[in-house]
């Protein structure tokens, strides 16, 4: 018997094999037979004064649930006593009043089983229990309400138990029918003569024509043509007597995405003169009732169906059906091993259909944990079934996981329903005896002898193929070994300490004994006190790599109140009486599960292949940002060059990931796992980014200013790192590289370093060349409108974050974000930066790398910005106050790159197009951010139809454009600064950017070009310059007006 808190529910919810409860079609979950009760309500109703059998004694109340009471007799008997007292006193309004004498006598008779009615407990005892009724009732109600996974099951169980009518059996979902029929029709009738019912490939909202080995799929929104239907038919061939053989499959439509049940329609194909073959569909002719009669109806359309004869050619009809067991996630490997242990000469055996496993391995889908097909011997019939964990997919989130049992090729409905009940009983019995079963085989799950039995299904749906063998012989060997362990004195600690996810919290499990004399002499041991005075355990470690016992804080289990700490084995000695030093633990996961904040995990393979180790692991340089003090040991990570760190799941996971990554690169002792980050702190950090929202206007080009502010101010909405990566960069003063798992793009095949220090990337031509169904691809995210952002030179430090959705069983509301660190961090991230740049579109790299540029005609008279001027502008526009900017970087001259000559923006400062020209030489400086402007009516710039739109990178976006200008020397900078000033109604600091009259007049040709083309309105521009003369140009206004007049 197992208390249901092992299933993430409450202690009052008990799986109870002795109690059978049927669930009807209208209940939730929809189908299946359940054995479970709410023990509190069950006992109260059993002993209630309204019970037709009269009051029950304590022994009578305990008898139906004796197996549960015996698990902890003292505690559970006290629980039953309180239920009985509550049943007799819940109608009292004043619980502080004395219990009347008659009630005391009745309660004593029930609890003490004493018919004389002597007051054994006394009124005070009952009064104390009654006073706690309200608190206990509220606690029980809250516990049930907090049960997120089994509330529907609880409601169905109690409502059915309270119903006095006979239990009803739920209807199973029929998914496929196999059969073969011969149809005889007169020669004059143009009708198919043989119709086959074959297996179906169940897929959401698909219509399937199934033939001997072919599947033709198409969306239900586009009905099949006659050609498509005829293509699914085998070719006609002549038969004796002039008869012809034609085949067509059953036309089936899956309606709805929440139920896998099939509604059956029969398709009728006939030839019409002048038209050809026509498909007619007869709805609501379900062949589950009378297949021959349904076919006769279909084939006899428009004629006398008495001449149509349908007969079975042999083999019978087989059914494929499924049913939902409940909302619990059953791990199929446990079910398989458990049934193997029970397999004897007289018991039902379940084996694995390895042929089917290997044949259809690639058909397993994401978001579903699929099992191999099991071979089940039932009433001399051999039938196959599978157990899968499914859930409704909504974007990256999965909701309401449930277990679906699918039965294949049942010969009739009686066998099908009998198997369903038998399989359900197997699974519920497994859950009921989970602790005792675990003590038999849990320690052997990693044993090669057990794994060689078949294919093990991992929790993250990764298949590990093991060497097959003679199943029967291996089963006997495993059972003998497990039976020998069962009779020994040593026990698996998980069978004694009821903690969920024990193995995930402790990589090396200890061995527990009840007598200190059973501890081997050469082993150290600790004493562990079980709760509720259930005894003392002596725990030691039987691992060569982790010989020292200790305790670890219980962070994952639902019953951590009862077990705040659990024993574990460690490589080094540690204080067994206190919480372990979290910085010294080596929690490392090889799967893609969501990590806790104290764990590291393996990075996906693509990130490793892109880096190609880069020889940085063997370089002699000393990395000041090395992480040797807390980076997982080489023996743990193997050849991995990077690890990912855990972050709390939530809408602001991206912010926390960057915070932990920044903390990690501060120094050798900056362990990111020690950083305490609360929800309030994340909300504060997010609120501070509102002032920097302008810098993300390119990525948020499809949102208005109001929508942007509302999104960022809503601290419980998802902070999308793909669109808000610039905010993270500017706020934390680091370069942020974002990798995403799961994108269907061509992955990088290799990385080669060029002579000038750059990189060349080679890509796989086809997706299937590089990855199988079980692998994921890491890619650089593509922002909206294709304008990826990269700015390596603004920030001195760099971090890497990783966006993914965990494993198939992760129930996430938002995509999760984690950080990635390298043991030699500063030696790796420059290479990532080069790869990142290389992945960006070339035209975008030119724009963002060389926003300010100029043709260097004369080195003595250069009209480009200097590095100091660029840094000053960066301080003014780019960074929040208090951020320092490095002055060590200097621009480089390049003779091979193209520079943008035309940039197109819209009214809210987003760039939607760019054109370029080749330059002989170029001097690059830092870019300005997108314009921080509000919606406005003032139009200083005009879009000229004469602009050559074909030169824009994104011509389809030019229709959205409200403003455009040519970029020519410093004129572009002046326009940018002036527009920024007037639209934000602010001022520029003249000591940061000075332009005198001599330099301004030197550019009059370029500015005059802007006026002549009509891109810039000269009056508006002149007025703006006059208004800013003291702060920007520092020239007399009369000269400025005269200059504007001169160029009219």
Swiss-Prot record:
Its main location: virion. Pfam families: DUF5757. It is found in: Virion. Keywords: Virion. It comes from the Viruses. GO terms for cellular component: virion component. Belongs to the ascovirus HvAV ORF146 family. This is Putative structural protein ORF84.
């Amino acid at each position: 018997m197992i208390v249901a808190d092992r299933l993430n529910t409450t202690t009052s919810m008990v799986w109870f094999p002795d109690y059978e409860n049927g669930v009807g079609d209208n209940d939730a979950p929809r189908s299946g037979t359940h054995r479970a009760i709410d023990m509190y309500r069950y006992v109260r109703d059993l002993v209630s004064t309204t019970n037709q059998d009269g009051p029950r004694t304590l022994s009578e109340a305990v008898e139906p649930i004796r197996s549960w009471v015996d698990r902890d007799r003292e505690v559970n008997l006290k629980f039953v006593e309180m239920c009985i007292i509550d049943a007799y006193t819940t109608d009292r309004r004043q619980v502080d009043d004395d219990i009347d004498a008659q009630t005391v006598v009745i309660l004593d008779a029930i609890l003490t089983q004493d018919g004389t009615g002597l007051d054994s407990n006394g009124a005070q005892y009952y009064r104390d229990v009654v006073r706690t009724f309200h608190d206990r009732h509220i606690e029980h109600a809250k516990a049930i309400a907090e049960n997120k996974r089994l509330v529907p099951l609880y409601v169905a169980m109690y409502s059915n138990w309270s119903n006095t009518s006979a239990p009803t059996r739920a209807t199973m979902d029929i998914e496929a029918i196999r059969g073969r029929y011969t149809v005889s029709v007169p020669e004059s009738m143009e009708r198919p003569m043989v119709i086959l019912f074959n297996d179906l490939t169940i897929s959401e909202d698909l219509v399937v024509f199934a033939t001997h080995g072919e599947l033709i799929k198409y969306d239900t929104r586009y009905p099949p043509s006659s050609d498509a239907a005829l293509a699914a038919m085998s070719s006609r061939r002549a038969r004796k007597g002039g008869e012809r053989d034609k085949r067509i499959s059953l036309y089936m439509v899956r309606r709805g995405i929440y139920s896998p049940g099939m509604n059956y329609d029969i398709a009728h194909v006939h030839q019409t003169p002048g038209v050809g073959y026509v498909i007619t569909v007869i709805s609501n002719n379900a062949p589950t009732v009378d297949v021959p009669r349904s076919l006769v109806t279909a084939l006899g359309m428009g004629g006398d169906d008495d001449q149509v004869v349908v007969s079975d050619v042999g083999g019978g009809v087989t059914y494929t059906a499924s049913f939902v067991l409940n909302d619990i996630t059953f791990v199929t490997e446990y079910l398989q091993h458990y049934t193997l242990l029970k397999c004897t000469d007289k018991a039902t055996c379940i084996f694995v259909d390895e042929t089917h496993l290997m044949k259809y391995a690639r058909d397993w889908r994401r978001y579903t944990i699929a099992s191999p097909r099991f071979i089940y011997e039932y009433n001399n019939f051999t039938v196959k079934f599978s157990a899968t964990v499914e859930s409704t997919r909504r974007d990256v989130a999965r909701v309401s996981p449930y277990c679906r049992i699918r039965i294949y090729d049942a010969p009739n409905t009686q066998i099908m329903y009998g198997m369903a009940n038998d399989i359900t009983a197997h699974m519920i019995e497994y859950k009921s005896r989970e602790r005792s079963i675990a003590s038999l085989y849990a320690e052997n799950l990693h044993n090669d002898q057990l794994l060689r039995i078949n294919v093990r299904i991992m929790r993250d749906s990764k298949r590990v193929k093991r060497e097959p063998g003679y199943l029967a012989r291996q089963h006997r060997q495993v059972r003998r070994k497990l039976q020998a362990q069962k009779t020994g004195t040593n026990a698996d600690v998980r069978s004694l300490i009821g903690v969920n996810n024990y193995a995930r919290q402790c990589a090396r499990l200890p061995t527990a004994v009840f007598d200190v004399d059973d501890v081997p002499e050469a082993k150290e041991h600790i004493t562990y006190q079980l709760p509720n005075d259930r005894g003392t355990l002596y725990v030691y470690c039987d691992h060569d790599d982790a010989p020292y016992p200790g305790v670890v804080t219980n962070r994952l289990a639902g019953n951590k109140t009862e077990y705040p700490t659990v024993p574990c084995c460690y490589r080094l000695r540690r204080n067994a009486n206190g919480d372990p030093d979290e910085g010294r633990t080596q929690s490392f996961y090889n799967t893609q599960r969501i990590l806790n904040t104290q764990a590291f995990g393996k990075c996906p393979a693509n990130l490793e292949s892109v880096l190609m180790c880069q020889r940085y692991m063997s370089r002699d340089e000393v990395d000041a940002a090395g992480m040797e003090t807390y980076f997982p040991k080489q023996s743990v990570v193997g050849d991995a060059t990077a690890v990912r760190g855990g972050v709390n799941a939530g809408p602001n996971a991206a912010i926390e990931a960057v915070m932990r990554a920044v903390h990690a690169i501060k120094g050798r002792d900056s362990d990111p796992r020690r950083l305490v980050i609360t929800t309030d702190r994340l909300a504060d950090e997010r609120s501070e980014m509102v002032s920097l929202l302008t810098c993300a206007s390119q990525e948020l080009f499809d949102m208005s200013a109001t929508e942007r502010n509302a999104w960022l101010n809503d601290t419980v909405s998802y902070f999308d790192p793909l669109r808000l990566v610039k905010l993270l960069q500017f706020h934390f003063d680091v370069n942020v590289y974002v990798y995403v798992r799961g994108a269907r793009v061509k992955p990088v095949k290799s990385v080669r370093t060029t002579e000038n220090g750059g990189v060349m990337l080679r890509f796989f031509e086809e997706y299937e060349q590089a990855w199988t169904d079980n692998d994921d691809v890491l890619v650089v995210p593509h922002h909206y409108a294709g304008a990826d952002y990269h700015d390596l030179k603004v920030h001195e430090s760099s971090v890497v974050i990783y966006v993914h959705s965990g494993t198939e069983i992760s129930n996430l509301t938002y995509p999760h974000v984690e950080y990635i660190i390298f043991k030699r961090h500063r030696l790796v991230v420059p290479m990532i930066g080069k790869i990142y740049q290389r992945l960006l579109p070339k035209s975008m790299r030119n724009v963002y790398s060389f926003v300010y540029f100029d043709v260097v005609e004369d080195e003595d008279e250069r009209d480009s910005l200097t590095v100091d001027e660029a840094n000053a502008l960066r301080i003014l526009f780019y960074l929040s106050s208090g951020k320092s900017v490095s002055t060590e970087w200097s621009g480089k001259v390049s003779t091979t790159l193209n520079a943008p000559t035309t940039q197109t923006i819209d009214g809210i400062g987003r760039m939607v197009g760019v054109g370029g020209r080749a330059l002989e030489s170029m001097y690059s400086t830092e870019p300005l951010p997108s314009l921080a402007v509000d919606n406005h009516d003032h139009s200083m710039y005009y879009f000229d139809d004469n602009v050559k739109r074909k030169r824009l990178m994104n011509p389809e976006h030019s229709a959205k454009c409200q403003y455009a200008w040519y970029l020519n020397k410093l004129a572009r900078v002046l326009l940018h600064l002036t527009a920024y000033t007037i639209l934000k109604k602010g001022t520029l600091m003249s000591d940061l950017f000075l332009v005198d009259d001599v330099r301004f007049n030197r550019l009059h040709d370029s500015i005059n070009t802007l006026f002549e083309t009509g891109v810039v309105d000269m009056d508006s521009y002149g007025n703006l310059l006059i208004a800013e003369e003291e702060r920007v140009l520092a020239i007399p206004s009369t000269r400025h007006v005269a200059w504007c007049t001169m160029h009219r």
